[in-house]
């Protein structure tokens, strides 16, 4: 299960979790709706694209927490009521315009997330808009493409499990009665909680394929040698499968990738953004419209175990908080 914070992300709807256009579409957009996100914190590079588009005349609208995004925008409230109004008016003020919706984790990570997403989907259809989903975990889209999900939500999956293999997940407190095997590169919360630790390579110490927030598979190459007893993560999984008498059918990285490309062809399309089929919206009730959207991240510098183990990142985080506090006082 990869959907931490109980993120309501439907695995059969790639157009929703990976978007309908690449990030570069921001530059051509005339109207941008940001929903449940602070892109300045969650993705500064993407936020710079939004600012560039705004400087060229694009209209930016924010639905969610009021934030300093470095550019002007219309704040359309903290809930989905305004979207429903636009739907009822059939989007008449936005006809024949290039409209882009940027979804943040604030819309996914709520108890009624699936229903709230139906509001957004209906909104997109009404405006004939394009959509980009902004994820805060580098492995999220790739894990979704691998169908790395359970039949239940994240919390329920943890609750009914006795033994948990935790692969680099440090943002969730696992109950003490669970037996935890932790696989990761840095001694963060997950490692401190673990009963068994399997030291894996950091992303810079092994080759890998990452699928970014727009659904583009990207190949990364090893930049430096591993440290201590760390092993490449694919090799750890392979060795563990052998110990559990369910040996996986590959012996090296080439064999693994051949199997990966055969079963999940999307990973073979390196550096390409594939078009995704749109799943039509379903009906929603009015109850989800009044629920306020909350941003998930507030500190860009401490969003993952590698960043949290860095003295430089800790200093930047401290300085950023001081600047924010001074702005509040003034």
Residue ranges and their predicted role:
Residues 2-270, 327-330:
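Non-catalytic alpha/beta scaffold blocks inside enzyme catalytic domains
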Residues 257-330:
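Long, low-complexity segments enriched in small/aliphatic residues
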């Amino acid at each position: 299960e990869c959907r931490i914070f109980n993120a309501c992300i439907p695995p059969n709807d790639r157009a929703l979790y990976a978007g309908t256009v690449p990030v570069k579409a921001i530059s051509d957009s005339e109207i941008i709706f940001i929903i449940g996100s602070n892109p300045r914190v969650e993705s500064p590079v993407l936020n710079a694209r939004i600012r560039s588009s705004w400087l060229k005349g694009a209209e930016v609208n924010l639905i969610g927490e009021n934030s300093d995004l470095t550019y002007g925008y219309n704040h359309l409230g903290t809930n989905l009521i305004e979207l429903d109004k636009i739907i009822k008016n059939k989007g008449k003020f936005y006809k024949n315009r290039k409209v882009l919706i940027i979804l943040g984790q604030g819309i996914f990570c709520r108890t009624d997330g699936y229903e709230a997403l139906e509001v957004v989907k209906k909104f997109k259809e009404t405006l004939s808009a394009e959509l980009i989903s902004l994820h805060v975990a580098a492995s999220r889209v790739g894990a979704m493409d691998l169908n790395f999900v359970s039949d239940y939500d994240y919390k329920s999956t943890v609750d009914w499990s006795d033994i948990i293999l935790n692969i680099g997940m440090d943002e969730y407190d696992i109950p003490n009665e669970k037996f935890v095997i932790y696989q990761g590169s840095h001694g963060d919360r997950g490692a401190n909680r673990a009963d068994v630790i399997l030291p894996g390579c950091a992303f810079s110490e092994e080759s890998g394929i990452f699928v970014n927030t727009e659904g583009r598979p990207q190949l990364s190459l090893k930049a430096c040698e591993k440290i201590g007893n760390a092993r490449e993560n694919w090799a750890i999984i392979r060795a563990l499968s052998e110990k559990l008498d369910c040996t996986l059918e590959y012996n090296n990285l080439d064999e693994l990738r051949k199997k990966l490309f055969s079963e999940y062809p999307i990973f073979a399309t390196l550096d390409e953004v594939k078009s995704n089929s749109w799943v039509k919206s379903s009906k929603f009730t009015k109850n989800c419209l009044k629920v306020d959207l909350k941003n998930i991240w507030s500190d860009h510098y401490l969003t993952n175990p590698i960043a949290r183990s860095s003295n430089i990142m800790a200093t930047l985080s401290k300085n950023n908080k001081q600047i924010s506090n001074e702005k509040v006082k003034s």
